[in-house]
Each structure stands twice: as structure tokens, then as C-alpha cells.
Curated annotation (Swiss-Prot):
The chain crosses the membrane at residues 4-24, 31-51, 59-79, 85-105. The lineage of its organism: Bacteria, Pseudomonadati, Pseudomonadota, Alphaproteobacteria, Hyphomicrobiales. Coiled coil: none annotated. Pfam families: UPF0060. GO terms for cellular component: plasma membrane. The keyword Glycosyltransferase does not apply. Keywords: Cell inner membrane, Cell membrane, Membrane, Transmembrane, Transmembrane helix. It is a multi-pass membrane protein. HAMAP family: UPF0060. Belongs to the UPF0060 family. This is UPF0060 membrane protein Mnod_6500. NCBIfam families: PRK02237.1. InterPro entries: UPF0060 (IPR003844).
């Protein structure tokens, strides 16, 4: 599994899992949302172990930018709220940081 695919899958799983808890506590949905939510959060954790990195902290730091970008896609696609220029600019900065972490030479 490629690192990018693992990061994107992890982001979707984490956001879906957290949204299930949000739906239960904030939107008044059934507690039955928690089962799939917990499964999604477990999948998120497993997927992060699949990235190509010798250090967990570096893998998590690089993942942060992908998570932010995926959260804005969720905001638009699932919640129907279009990200504004500040959202997009912030995500671009975070993705630049992700690229530095992932692509920087290691010696």
C-alpha cells in the first residue's frame, strides 16, 4: 500500500469515526452510530501503521496535513459547507509541510 493511499484512507476513516460520535452527541442520532464509528477509528489506527516511515512521530506529523485537507473535503461533500479561502490557504500550508516532512532528505 502506498503512503499516500494509506494517509487518505486513514483520514477518511478517522473523520468518519469522529463524525459518528459528533452525530450521536451533537445531532441527536442513535447510539448505534458508535459501533461503525469505533470500527472506523480502529481502521484509522491500522492504516497509519502501513505508511513508509521509520518513526511513528514523523508518520503522524506528515499525516496531519492530509487529515486537514480531507476534513475540508468532508466539510464540503458531506456537510454541504464550501471551504472559504482561509480554509484552503491553511490546508495548502499544511500540505506543504507534509511534503517537506515526507520528501526531505534523511541522513
Amino acid at each position: 500500500m502506498t503512503t499516500l493511499l494509506a494517509y487518505v484512507g486513514a483520514a477518511l476513516a478517522e473523520i468518519a469515526g469522529c463524525f459518528a460520535v459528533w452525530a450521536w452527541l451533537r445531532l441527536g442520532r442513535s447510539p448505534l452510530w458508535l459501533g461503525p464509528g469505533l470500527a472506523s477509528l480502529a481502521l484509522f489506527a491500522v492504516l497509519l501503521t502501513r505508511v513508509e516511515s521509520g518513526a511513528a512521530g514523523r508518520a503522524y506529523a506528515a499525516y496531519g496535513g492530509v487529515y486537514i485537507a480531507a476534513s475540508l473535503v468532508w466539510l464540503w461533500g458531506v456537510e454541504g459547507q464550501r471551504p472559504d479561502r482561509w480554509d484552503l490557504g491553511g490546508a495548502a500550508l499544511c500540505l506543504a509541510g507534509t511534503a517537506v516532512i515526507l520528501l526531505g532528505p534523511r541522513g
